[in-house]
């Protein structure tokens, strides 16, 4: 799920559910894929450092929507909070700030447990989903990766919040908020939200993406029909499953390959042509 600014929303999500609502979908939800990343799989996480505990309601956030809310335009509740602050450093030097809401974790021990859990898992997904495709080095550089939105910076901040709400990503802050109490397949939803912040804009504005969508003629999940951004975000986990996971179910693999061959081919080419890192995963990209 993603929340966008007005201009950004009209640009990257030009295709809405109106064009897809009657299209066939293969899986009811992303969770139907089941967990594909195991605890013992390698992680690019180098270290997790506790920085401080904030005071006087230093941070501001907007809560996720309830699970029964179907309209993403519904008003979200905003609130101030304090947090245990951690920095997760990855092998490339990339840093993600974790803010663990003290209303969720009352003490440092619990906060560190959850920060480490998600920092490690973020280190297990392909690097380009975590670290983005646009580099900012004093000034914006497009790096020949397509038009995009100028926001594909990767994941800078992850908020770990209290409550049973839907996770969601915020382009403007390069962050997403997650809720451990929500019963998601966490590896899949982490990749989904990370995709919003790393490749969503580049892919939805790439001239070769929508022809691939049309050629497939269907969507991988029911939710992927919401708009083009959610299509990208849900599709990425299925691409990872068939290209990067050893011993993945042959039955599921064949079903996915048959359902969205053109999207998968696009993603293979996109990763190869732009020399995107999939570390720590080794992915079998097709010609």
Feature roles, as predicted:
Residues 2-4, 26-29, 263, 272:
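Terminal low-complexity, poorly structured segments
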Residues 15-162, 166-167, 276-287:
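A metal-dependent hydrolase signature that marks the N-terminal structural subdomain at the beginning
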Residues 1-17:
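Classical Sec-dependent N-terminal signal peptides that target proteins to the secretory pathway
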Residues 75, 92-109, 131-287:
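Active-site-flanking segments in enzyme catalytic domains
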């Amino acid at each position: 799920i993603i929340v966008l600014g007005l201009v950004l929303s009209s640009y990257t999500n030009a295709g809405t559910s109106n064009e897809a609502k009657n299209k066939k979908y293969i899986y009811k939800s992303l969770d139907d894929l089941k967990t594909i990343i195991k605890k013992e799989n390698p992680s690019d996480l180098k270290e997790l450092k506790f920085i401080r505990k904030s005071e006087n309601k230093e941070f501001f956030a907007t809560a996720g929507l309830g699970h029964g809310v179907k309209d993403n335009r519904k008003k979200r509740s905003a609130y101030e909070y304090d947090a245990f602050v951690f920095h997760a450093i990855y092998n490339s030097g990339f840093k993600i700030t974790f803010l663990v809401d003290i209303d969720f974790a009352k003490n440092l021990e619990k906060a560190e447990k959850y920060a480490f859990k998600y920092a490690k898992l973020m280190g297990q997904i392909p690097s380009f989903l975590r670290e983005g495709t646009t580099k900012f080095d004093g000034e914006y550089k497009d790096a020949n990766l397509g038009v995009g939105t100028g926001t594909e910076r990767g994941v800078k901040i992850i908020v770990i919040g209290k409550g049973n709400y839907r996770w969601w990503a915020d382009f403007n802050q390069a962050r997403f908020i997650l809720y451990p109490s929500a019963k998601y397949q966490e590896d899949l939803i982490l990749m989904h939200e990370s995709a919003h912040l790393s490749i969503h804009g580049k892919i939805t504005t790439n001239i070769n993406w929508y022809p691939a969508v049309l050629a497939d003629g269907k969507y991988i999940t029911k939710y992927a029909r919401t708009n083009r951004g959610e299509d990208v975000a849900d599709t990425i986990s299925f691409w990872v499953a068939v290209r990067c996971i050893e011993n993945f179910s042959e039955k599921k693999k064949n079903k996915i390959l048959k359902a969205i061959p053109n999207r998968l081919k696009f993603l293979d080419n996109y990763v190869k042509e732009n020399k995107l890192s999939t570390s720590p995963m080794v992915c079998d990209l097709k010609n």
